[in-house]
Amino acid sequence: MTFCILFLFWTITHLARRILTRQGAELTKANIVAVLGTGAVGALAYTFTDTFWFSAVEGEVYALSSMFTALVVWLMLKWEEQADQPHSMRWIVLIAYLMGLSIGVHILNLLTIPALVFIYYFRKTQRITFKGIAVSTLISGAILIFINSIIIPHTVYIGALFDLFFVNSLGLPVNSGLVFFVVALLGALGVGVYFTHKKGRTVLNLVLLSTLMILIGYSSYASVTIRAAANPPMNSNNPSNPFALYSLLNRDQYGDKPLLYGPQFSAPTSGYKYKDVRYLDDDGKYKTVSIISGYEHPDEFMHLFPRMWNYAASKESYKSWSAYRTRTDYERDENGEIVRDAQGRPNKIEVLDFGRRTLWDDGSGYEPLVIVEPTFRENLNYFFTYQLNHMYWRYFLWNFVGRQSDIQPTDAIITDGNWLSGIKWIDELYLGPQDNLPDEIANNKGRNTYYFLPFLLGLIGLIYQLNRDPRNFSIVMWLFVMMGIALVVYFNTSPNEPRERDYVYAGSFYAFCIWIGLGVLAVCDLIVWATRRKGLMAPIAATVVCMVVPGILAAQNWDDHDRSHRTMARDIGWNYLQSVLPNAIIINYGDNDTFPLWFNQEVDGVRPDVRIMNTSYLGAEWYIDELKTKANDAPGIPFTLPRSKYTYTNDMLPIENIVDRPLELKEAIDFIRNEDPRTKLVLSNGSKIDYLPSNRFALPVNKDNAIASGIVKESDRDLMVDTIYLELPKRTIDKSEMMLLDMLAHFDWKRPIHFTQVYILQSLGLLNYLQFDGYSYRLVPIYTPNRSVHEIGRIDPDYITPLLTETFRYGNIADPRTYADYFIQYNLSASKARESFARAAKEYVFRGDSIQAIRLLDMGLEKLPPQQIRYTDANTFPFIEGYYMAGAPDKGDSLLMSYARNLMQYIDYYLDFQGIQGDMVTQTIIDKMQSLDRLYYLAAYMGRQDVLAQLNDYYRTLGIYENELIHPDLSTPSDSVQIPE
């Protein structure tokens, strides 16, 4: 990242010199100081922006990608500076090589190409014309398409076709055809470069040489294939042959999304799209299979600019972000008659006025379907409201105006994650009152306010460059738009992204920081005009004044970007691995659950006996193959289905309940494996597919193996059931679920199986056969009905207590210098980190060991203190209840009132909201009141009169509970007052 800032500094100083030396003027000492000031202010401003700083300390590709962006822009400016020299084209050749090299980092760097083309055009042209601009735009688009759509995918694809011939027809080894093609292609380009140079064909020589350099840089991907061929334990997509590499580069796993023309989320399907794919079979030959690659849609449901396209996204979120309207209508019964009240008056209701309704006959012979499609206006509303405003301009203002908090908002709410200036009257216009803030909001380290200063200086610099140097202004604007708004159009984002995406637009913020730097020149000119004095004082004063911008960025962003003392990202993976038994299989989902485990195991060598299985990948044949093999010290997963049953087939497996009894799981898997035509389901088109003949299954329990493997203690033998009965609450299962059933059918209780997320078990009907081990759930043959979503599985305090007190690590969260940001708090919540202490403590209370229970509760609050981890019902209520149950009422009262004061602060604050803003926080007030009520009921049940008195005083100040019967002062616990679940 240091080099990124260095190249940005040089870029800004170059552009500043172009402004100051126009018409051949010489640089004076004052000008040199001004130039250096522009570079320092702009580069330092970008250094301390929220998005860039976050990317700089994140283990991701975007930091290196930013460096490539800054480097190629600076190199093109170096060419522009030396364009008249004999060997100036070497800069363009170097840029071509770096472009090819950067493809291996991220393709976002290609978006600098339009700016580079215009630098070339402006340098080579004295008179700018509309035709020249249009031609330059077309050329830049052609170069983009050539690299992104031809070089990146099709060089590999053509090599794959050669490999197909060499392997299947000539019997040569895999990748021999690819090697032949690469050598032939590079050789042909080399010959072309030689002869065009010899014949003086300068332009063609430059094109061929640049193409050759792009390919040489792009050849860094060879390391991916070489690594994959070595079969390492982690081998994503297994690109060990050119067809697999082509699929990886073509991003097949992400699917397609419409950009300018296509269907919307409600469009019906009229058929499937098919494509041929080739893969290596067990005999070492390529096989070809036709697979479904997407859906066909009727022509009448294809539209321009389909922004609301994702059928898997939340329809309600699409509607809320598209500024839908409501209208008043009459309530009608099932017969269509108007519903009337006792006086005969019609009932009026608010009806969603969204989309247009189209009748569509699907050819089935039934009544036409009513399809509700978003209108073009609603698509535009969604584009401007969500995709542009929420997913770009909000991020832009985060970086140059300020940020409300580090909490990711859900839908269009005003309480979290918005931009914030620090200027009270402006912020109150759209975020509500800014006085009387709750402590958690006021003290959120992600709450950063810059008072519009970076934005205003950048705007001044933008106008200044537009006025003084319109050519270079257009170049910076190309960078700003292509790496910002153009990406918004390209990504066509669906609502409710799993994480904030501001890092994608770092290149656009980089461009704006160029204008921040150039704003120093404008301020310098203003000082000269005001003082009527030229000399060193004006640029020095301008630089000092403008240094306020990077200064305020650094001061405000320092605390929430300081990752020192924090080790939670590593420790959470350690905890997951340490929570499982020896030789276990741990099954998880998604990035946050998996990458920390992989790091601990592959880098730090933690628990090599454990096999990690990510269900997000379990639908891919390469991952199933990988799981079958030994990794580190862990044996493969006991899958038994052959490759023919999961390689480009059985993505969805129907369930037909034709067997009126629970099938033993082995029988069910054998039924899938069977090739007898009688075990196939015949579709309407005559094709035959595998299916399951029942949704009820029996999993026999080998009690001796369960005890020998440590799954169950000998003392709990009598608690084990003989058979676990599963019932799948669905009509189909996907490939990952099919493979999980295969594993369960054949593991024979010889290896412990742990899960990090209970939803995986919910889909398999296993929620009542779990043991919570703190961070993971162990599959056990002991029936344990669930009491609530927060208390799933049984607890063995003898097993979990040493883990909680001696083994687990807590990321140094207890240190007040450690910043527990939104991601840390989310992961702690998902892993039930603090709740583990309370659940274990409750088991000790049941045993009669109150001392140990209190010790665990104290340790939970010590390791993960409320001052660092935000209060929630899930992570606080069990501790209060635990203290009361363990006979420590004073500690329970203290924690209860701390949480109550937190809730009261929020309620007091949100009750100040008025009008539409008040409507937007109504549900939040209700949620906080319900939490406060839970605390009241608990205090009443426990007979805590002092606490009740304080809570009743608060309720009276609100004036919302005038009737004392709602919240009575109970002198003794009453059976009529129950602790709500």
State where each predicted segment sits.
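Short helix- or helix-capping micro-motifs
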Residues: 39-47, 99
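ER/secretory pathway lumenal C-terminal domains and tails of membrane proteins involved
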Residues: 13-24, 36, 51-52, 57-66, ...
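Short hydrophobic/aromatic helix or loop-helix immediately within or flanking a transmembrane segment
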Residues: 1-7
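Interfacial loop-to-helix junctions that mark the boundaries of transmembrane helices
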Residues: 27-32
